[in-house]
Amino acid sequence: MKFSVLLPTRNGGAYLENCIRSILEQNYADMELVISDNANTDSTPQIVAMFTCDPRVKSLRIDQPVSVTDNWNNAFRASSGDYTLMMGDDDYMLPCCLERIEEILERNNQPDCIVYNAYSYVAPDSINGNAQSFYSDSHFRFGPDLRVERFIEPGERFEIVRNMFRFKVGIPLNMQTVLVGRKAADKIRGGLFQAPFPDHYALNSLLLTAERWVFSPEKLLVVGLSPKSFGHYVYSNQQGGGLAYLGIKDDFDGRLPGNVLLNGMHVWLNLLKQNYSELLQGVAVDRAGYVRRQVYSWFLQLRLGTITVGEFRRNFSLLSPSDFGGLLAAIVDRESWERLWHMLCSWNRSDAETQWRSLHSLNEVVDIRQFAQWLSHRGAVER
């Protein structure tokens, strides 16, 4: 069984070597690493050249910068494995990751997709210039119905997608935490990765169309956040920079200022509805859910000092009477209360910890490879 690890990169040279080493150090023979160099102008070409003597490495170079989505598709088209796994240049594959994935596949008779968990690591200077490292023991907080390894039935998967249209996320929307079978990927209408958020669109398309999904609670890698990540722009409230990073626009009727992820989500939800209208009959983007989440983002931006009181008030003037009516639903929405409570409890904490629940500061660790070693040492102590 062959694995293709996709590694599209754009000026991630400062982090790339650790990522590549973590992949090539895997004790698994039948794999390929496909690196797509998106017209990098930093040290990336020199770092990639260090590894091209390894026959498992397939290196591609794009001479003129393209969008994130186009670069991802470039890597995917060049791959040949039975299953693909995406990595960012600031991520890290933990030891035995591919062996453990193969075991999950064998236990479940080679499903189309596997969703699993990960650790999160925030590199210094990634969020508003905070020089501290942070980590989370769970990259994603799954619901109580996803605790042990099992199949996710088609009806459950449809409900996960339906809840996306309500702006409620039930699985991590990161390609790093989902293994995708090639046959399932090739069935996606319009191609696997589509703008504005290629991973979000791909995963929801697969939830709708792939025959067999398996959930595993195992943590197989570290999802990194660095000063060059898209997450850096989101958590540092640099919305314009985030859009430029992705090379997209998020304009649509009824668009509100606030969180760029929510506006991008609105766009790809409509694209999903357009491409799978027969599977999504009666499902539509929930305006009230969108407004509720954006209003929360305004409170958060005010708390972080990235908008003024005047801008905060002007944002509310953009809401229609029906939008205000929809906000009343927040009274009975548990997630809204949890978000508000977390923000209040984090009032005197760092910007990173205010925005990211379950985040912990980490001393004497300055990069993701050190964090992986710290995890290994901690595990040995706990055992």
Show which residues each predicted segment covers.
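C-terminal subregions of glycosyltransferases and related glycan-biosynthesis enzymes
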Residues: 117, 219-383
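Nucleotide-sugar donor-binding/catalytic module of glycosyltransferases
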Residues: 1-238
